[in-house]
C-alpha cells in the first residue's frame, strides 16, 4: 500500500469523523472536502477541490479502502474500509488506529503531541503508553507501519511518521519543514510549552466542533 498525501488526508478524515461525529458519517463529497481543507487539526493545510477529493476517492475505492454508500436517490456518501473490516488485512486496536489517523492528518509528531491530539479518538494514560503503542506499530508482525525519525537539532523528543506512503525517505519528503522561533528560555520550559499546547488544542477542538455544526446544517439544507 502506497498512498498519496491527498489519499491519506481523505482516509484520515473518514476515520476521524466516524468516531467524533458518527451522526454525519458516512460523508458526502462536499462535507469530506471541507473536512480535508480544515485549517485546524490539519498539517499541512490543504486547499483541495471536490474534483481532487473525488479522484482520491476513486483511487482508494480501486484498492478497496473506500466504499460508496447511497440510499435511494440521495447524494452518494463515502466510508472507509481502511482497517478492521471483516476480510481486510489491517487490524488495529483503538489506540493504534488513533495514532495512524492523527499521523495521516497532521504529519510527523512527537509522542506527547500524539497523546494530546488523539484525545477525541482514544485515551492514553501517559506519554509512556503512547510510546509503547508506537513501538508496537514499528514492530508489527505484518511489517512496520510507523518510523521513528532522527531527533531534530534543539528538540527534546523525536517525531514519528507513518509509512503508508512508502519508505522513510518518501515519508520525510512529505513532511513540512519546521522552524524553531522560541528563545532558549522558552525552549527549556516544558511546563509553559505544555500549557500553551493544551490551550491551542482546546481552541482547535472548539473551532472544529463549530465547523462540524455548520457542515451538518449545510447538509440538512441541501438534502
From Swiss-Prot:
Between which residues do disulfide bridges form? Answer: none
Give the domain of life.
Bacteria
SUPFAM superfamilies noted in UniProt: Winged helix' DNA-binding domain
Give the signal sequence positions. Answer: none
Q: Which family does it belong to?
A: Belongs to the UPF0502 family.
Protein name listed in UniProt: UPF0502 protein Sde_2426
Native organism: Saccharophagus degradans (strain 2-40 / ATCC 43961 / DSM 17024)
List the lineage, top down: Bacteria, Pseudomonadati, Pseudomonadota, Gammaproteobacteria, Cellvibrionales
Amino acid at each position: 500500500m502506497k498512498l498519496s498525501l491527498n489519499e491519506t488526508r481523505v482516509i484520515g478524515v473518514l476515520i476521524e469523523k466516524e468516531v467524533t461525529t458518527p451522526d454525519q458519517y458516512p460523508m458526502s463529497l462536499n462535507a469530506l472536502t471541507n473536512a480535508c481543507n480544515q485549517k485546524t487539526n490539519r498539517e499541512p493545510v490543504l486547499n483541495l477541490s471536490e474534483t481532487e477529493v473525488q479522484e482520491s476517492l476513486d483511487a482508494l475505492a480501486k484498492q478497496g479502502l473506500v466504499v460508496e454508500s447511497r440510499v435511494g436517490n440521495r447524494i452518494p456518501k463515502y466510508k472507509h474500509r481502511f482497517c478492521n473490516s471483516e476480510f481486510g488485512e489491517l487490524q488495529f486496536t483503538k489506540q493504534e488506529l488513533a495514532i495512524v489517523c492523527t499521523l495521516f492528518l497532521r504529519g510527523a509528531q512527537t509522542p506527547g503531541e500524539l497523546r494530546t491530539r488523539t484525545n477525541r479518538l482514544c485515551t492514553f494514560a501517559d506519554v509512556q503508553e503512547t510510546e509503547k503503542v508506537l513501538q508496537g506499530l514499528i514492530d508489527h508482525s505484518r511489517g512496520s507501519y510507523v518510523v521513528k525519525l532522527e531527533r531534530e537539532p534543539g528538540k527534546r523528543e523525536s517525531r514519528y511518521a507513518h509509512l503508508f506512503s512508502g519508505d522513510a525517505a518518501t515519508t520525510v519528503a512529505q513532511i513540512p519543514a519546521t522552524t524553531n522561533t522560541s528563545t532558549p528560555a522558552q525552549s527549556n520550559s516544558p511546563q509553559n510549552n505544555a500549557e500553551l499546547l493544551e490551550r491551542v488544542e482546546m481552541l482547535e477542538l472548539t473551532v472544529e466542533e463549530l465547523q462540524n455544526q455548520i457542515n451538518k446544517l449545510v447538509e440538512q439544507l441541501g438534502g
